Amino acid sequence: MYQVLAITGYKPHEIGIFNEQHDQLPFLKKALSKKITQLKEEFDIKWIITSGQPGVELWAAEAAIELKSSYPDLKVATLAPFHNQDERFQEAVKTLYEFVWDHSDYRDYITKRPYDNPAQLRSKNEFIVEKSDASLVLYDSETEGTPKFFLNYALKKQHQKTYPIFYLTPDDLEEMIRDQLDDETWN
């Protein structure tokens, strides 16, 4: 049983998503919801933690918030790396961030000040790994991107003690999209 699951992955531009109307975004959100559900049921996850970073983290937090109606014991925590993280976000992303922040069961800032140096982002990854029992990462080893910084800490923790890292890969996403399209074709 893992009480606390950290979720991270790519920022939108790293996977070619440049707005909330992207045609594959609903599939990605559904895949995140499906994977969170699977891990919740298999390991009795109680908390989902993200930093509220645009992309996979916000979409996963949104999915977890929606899943709370089916799983009332599921809680969501948003641990932003610094104050005013959202001030440079595009309006649609800022709206989603505010929704996630407002609907999180716990929210706080890891560093208690506005952004002033990259060390705040490193400490975010380290802090979230330390506060979690397992992680879910949307990641492709051939397209490193920002998840690699989180994975550095997660792999380090995994070598020291039991710390499962669950992956959601582009191949997994493609398979889920094909399955969903097949289901829609037959229904």
Task: Go through the PLM ranges and name each one.
Residues 1-186:
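Acidic/glycine-enriched connector segments
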